[in-house]
């Protein structure tokens, strides 16, 4: 697997940050701005969230349409080997970014590694499903409104890059040192959009389906090309 610490956003450096890290820092700032704008809309212009109503996506333009396009493009870039400014951890499933090791493969050690990382990955999966079900239950029982449930997706959108750039709690389970070797690196969208499963409507379900597709492609590549 191709590894270059200069290209890994989560790798701290005592020298000046790499180009890709600078880009990720700017993206984090951008996502924080998105969170603040969405929070402002929640109180000042709640009608902007009508795009979440069933087929409301097609009724009138809104600020959330811009966010939908950004999210959709981001997921498409995960599905194609584009030369975009994204971490190697997100592209390592493509042949173009693969460098085979020179030593003979220890198949037993490889199998043990695959099993251990997969077990760790699905511990994370179970925890996230539990969190998603908890949020969904709060929504279904009317404790939190739909717009607030959507805001959790935006919060997760910010937390995604906090995990990459600052600190990731999932490393405690995954036991990996950096995002480049992370088994669940491209789980970001399926985790981010999981609250939208309960929202329904074209806006939410189009993102959920696309996120599920990106996740399935990632998982298939890991199984076929470990």
Where are the regions a protein language model picked out?
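Membrane-interface segments at the starts/ends of alpha-helical transmembrane spans
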Residues: 16-23, 50-66, 184-188
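Hydrophobic alpha-helical membrane-embedded segments
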Residues: 31-47, 54-91, 140-143, 150-163, ...
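Short membrane-interface loop/juxtamembrane segments of multi-pass integral membrane proteins
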Residues: 94-118, 178-189
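Membrane-proximal helix-loop-helix units in multi-pass membrane proteins
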Residues: 112-178
